[in-house]
Each structure stands twice: as C-alpha cells, then as structure tokens.
Amino acid sequence: MSEHNSWNPKDEDHCWDAIWADNARDCWVRRVEFRHFAGSAVNLQKQTSRITVEDCIAGEPVSETGGWRRCVFITRGQQTLIQRCVSRQGIHDFAAGFCAAGPNAFVQCEGENSLGFSGSIGSWAAGLLFDIVNIDGNDISFKNLEQFQFGTGWNTANSMMWQCTGSTLYCYSPDSDNRNSAHGCWGTLTGNAEWTSSNDHVQPRSLFYAQLEKRMGKEA
C-alpha cells in the first residue's frame, strides 16, 4: 500500500511503483494486493526475462490521470507471463513498453473501470499474446498509434488476441510479413488483421493453457 494524503484524491507525493524489476531472471510475483500506487503495480524493465506475475490485484490508484501514470502491469522484458491479475481504475492496465523483445503473455486478466487502452504503449513490442483479457470500459489496441506519446507509430507486430473483450478491439497488421490476429473476440472490432470467429466462442478456451498442457501434461 502506498501511503498518501487522504484529503487529496490526486496526490502524487507518494510511492509510484510497487515492484520495479531489472537485471532479473526466473522470478515470481504472486498473490499480492496493490493499493493507491500512482504508477505501476509491477514494472518489468528491459533486462528482465522468464518472470511470472500471477493472482495479483491492483486498485484504488491515487494520481492524476495522464502521462505515464497507472501503467499497472507493464513489461519491457521478454518471456514474461502475467496471468489471473485484476486492475481497477488503471489507464493502461496490461501493457508492453518500447521495443519489448517478447514473447510476452497476458492470460486471463481483468481490467475494471479502465481509463485507457491495453496493449503496447511503445513502439514495436512484438510477440504479444492477450489470452482471455477482458477490459471493462476501454480498448485493446494492436495498431499504429501515430503521434501518441511523442510518435509511437506501430505498437506491435506478430501478436495475437485470443477470446478477449473490450469496448473496441483494434487489430491491424503493419504489413504482410508482420501480421497480427484476433480469434473469438467480442466487442466493436476494427482493423485489417486476421479475424476468425468474431463475437463467438472458440476452442480451446485458452490458447496459452492448451499449449502448456500439450507441452507439460495436465498436471501443469
């Protein structure tokens, strides 16, 4: 919990990031509740890999609602897994940063009362999987963000949405060699990427867990 001035609902003179990791590998963040942080619950930097964040809840952020605030679960690393996490009143609830090498997976995550889109908030964060990610009140964006944050341009390529929901799901492909896709997704759908079974259910329910079971067996 980040201690703040209770009389100021937009106080920022308190802790911004709860967990900030860099130069780290083979780590876990598990079953943590985060409250009142202005920036991130978990912020994984470029030199992080093979990190799992699971079963965490972040809510009641205290901050302004612009800039780089409330990027709640964000990775700039590679081979990171964020699963079964909940973010409330975040701006970018589940996000990847500038040129995150990937692959990075967000699996069975929920954004409640979201104030901004989830997806990559930086340029060319390739190899994202959004698998059963539900964003209440905002969007999931795989597209050209143009001048967002000083000229982000294309935010991702070779990425996939699988059974996701949101206000609007933007899924565009930069070109024929860098294709994004969306399968079994619900909401207002837009983009030139590959779409299958839109506003319908697909099997398996979770692509990530199906591949994990195939690789490791049901005990995984």
Describe the function of each predicted region.
Residues W7-P9, A18, A58, I82:
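Active-site-proximal segments of catalytic enzyme domains
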Residues P9, E64-G66, F142-N144:
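Short acidic, glycine/proline-rich loop/turn micro-motifs
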Residues W16-I19, W68-V72, D93-A95, S114-S120, ...:
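Short, recurring structural edge motifs at helix starts
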Residues K10-A24, L44:
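Extracellular beta-strand-rich solenoid/capping regions of secreted or surface-exposed proteins
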Residues S2-S6:
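Extracellular/periplasmic ectodomains of large secreted or surface enzymes and adhesion receptors
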Residues M1, R25-H36, Q47-S63, R76-H92, ...:
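Right-handed parallel beta-helix
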Residues A105-A220:
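Gly/Ser/Thr/Ala-enriched C-terminal appendages of enzymes
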